[in-house]
Amino acid sequence: DKALRSLRSRSFFLELAMEHYADELLALCGVGRTNLLYTGGGHCYLLLPNTERVRRGAAAWNARFNDWLCAQFGVALFLAHGFTECSGNELINHPAEDSPYRQMFRRVSSALAAHKLRRYDASMLRRLNGRRADGGRECRICGRTDSLVDDRCEWCRLFVELSEKVQRCGMYYVSADPGAAYDFALPAADGTAYVAFMDEKTARGRMNGGGAVTRIYSKNMAYTGLRYSTRIYVGDYAYSNSIEQLARSAAGVKRIGVCRMDVDDLGQAFVAGFERPDR
């Protein structure tokens, strides 16, 4: 089932989707990536204007993105959001003895938790409950029953195909033009974004030829003179793409193990704040 390739591209897809979500929200609010405080691991923190227009826009964009996630992946994926008002003093943790920075992040976390507990409105629940399985065979990777080819659904086939491109291609070109070649589509705040994986030469040629471009994500490198480009960090290294070859390299029994690492309590660290005892 090419599980190794699928795992890599699934993880990358989630990171790229999160970057895209944040960039669309920033553009919707009329600010740049300077206002993106942190993104990674399926989370992001942004500093946005405290206006009614921004609050409505953020809520509408979140609802649109979750509608798309639900249509594509059912209840397996959901993007919760929450926000709170804050002042300049809270951002610089003043007065420090009152820990306003910590309280600010606690308010955000509470709003986020509340959204997770109430994910769907009545119309979405009716849509989910109205779905009926077609009685066909299930995808042998994820269990979906629609659009199977070789016992794989559309997204699982895509993730296998993308794995090689994640390693080989250094540019991820986002455009609103459905006529150009693309690898997959994501929702945009005002339409659809089409994502194509390519090398630098192809990306520059497409731009110089007048091709539509919304933004470009460059892998691990910052490119001078390449407009619309944002560097993102991608772990594209691999000893081998073959599980069999990895197993043959083992000492003793020819099999592999999986090591999964994570940063403990990263969210709690943001909530608690990074206070300096001497200040």
Predicted regions and their residues:
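Regulatory and interdomain segments flanking nucleotide-handling catalytic cores
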Residues: 1-279
